[in-house]
Amino acid sequence: MTQAATLTQQQLQRVLDYTRTRRHYKRNRAIILLTHYAMLRVGEVAALRYCDVVDADGEIKAETTLSAAQTKGNKARKVWFAEKIRVELAAYVAAHKPKQLTQPLFYTQRSEGFTANTLTHIVNGIYKHAGISGATSHSGRRTGLTNLAERGVGVRVLMALAGHSNM
């Protein structure tokens, strides 16, 4: 299997521009940016709940801790939300007020949380329709980590951000 494509800033902008023309654009922009800037796996995005991103005062958190059940490696890990993500999450949350803070952050028309598989199809479709060849649901995570590595971020920091315990 080939590696997911990494995106240039221009390609990411094309993807974000494309999402603006579609239904559920606030949700889709937030999902794309969570994979790119928080370097979350699609399964981790699907597992997010409102309480993971919104504090008791209704503000978007700067960081959160994903539980072991929410991560691929079954190990809790800390995730940081860049300002770009917080702005998009705030726009999404303002338009989709939760009934309960424990409810899934991203949900279907029946108010059920998306499965990782469904979100994979959504993200892959966004990349395809935006004309990004070779991009998959893993491209955002790979792009974010690659960009940090190219800027000289240390391997141990990258491992922590990625939730990897081994090189």
Residue ranges, per PLM feature:
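Conserved tyrosine-mediated DNA breakage-rejoining catalytic core shared by Y-recombinases
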Residues: 47-85
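DNA breakage-rejoining catalytic core of tyrosine-based enzymes
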Residues: 1-13, 73-82, 99-101
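Short, polar N-cap/turn motifs at the start of nucleic acid-interacting alpha helices
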Residues: 53-55, 133, 154-167
